[in-house]
Amino acid sequence: MNPILKTCLLIAFLFSSTGLPALAQSVQFVPETDTYFKLNSVLRAYLQAKDDRDAGASDQLSIGPSLQFYVKPLVRLKNITTFDLDDSKPRALVFETGYRSVTAPGALPINRMEPVVTFHFPLKAGFLITDRNRADLDWTSQSFTWRYRNKLTLERTVAVFSYHLIPYVAAEPYYEEKYHKWSTTDLYAGCLFPVGSHVQFNVYYEHENNTGKRPNQQVNDIGLALYLFFSLEGKK
């Protein structure tokens, strides 16, 4: 089967199989701010501050920098991401490394390294698939754990009169070393709202099913992320 078709079917299946139980769960609010600085044509740095509740975690604050390296943009990707302010979207391949300090009340602080490899695939009719492969390498004063996350996103820019917004759906399963299995699945439905040339909002709904512990945990989040984009390219 075509890998693109497999991706679309996977996202649709995961939403249909876990969407109904989500209605019975409480909803939490997850804020986030990412500030991006384009250094040159192939390097970009950003600082992220996020209320991190991934994989069944309690209320946590995650903050830290990342550095991205990407290849030259493809014409097809540039054409379908014209109105998206994220400069990495037109790149077929993006390498990233980051550090996060993760803190929570009553818990040991976590030092996390985040190596990431992301692929972008242009589709017909203006659709874009993003395949993000990320590892979370977590150290505390007492232990080391790791997990692997694979986030598949399907999006398309839509014109509403003269304004262009970008709705999307996504699925992200986690393999957690401490449970020795694929223990968590996150499902997303959201929309990106560009505002001017430096600001973009990401408003989304997230349903998480965590089978790492018994009984299973199901969490629903409403997320609001603020993305700020600046270019230092050519400045002294």
Task: Please provide the spans of the model-predicted regions.
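Detector for outer-membrane/organellar transmembrane beta-barrel domains
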Residues: 119-120, 128-173
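Residues that define the transmembrane beta-barrel architecture of outer-membrane proteins
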Residues: 27-29, 59-63, 109-113, 144-150, ...
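Repeated loop/turn-to-beta-strand initiation elements of outer-membrane beta-barrel proteins
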Residues: 41-47, 74-78, 92-95, 124-129, ...
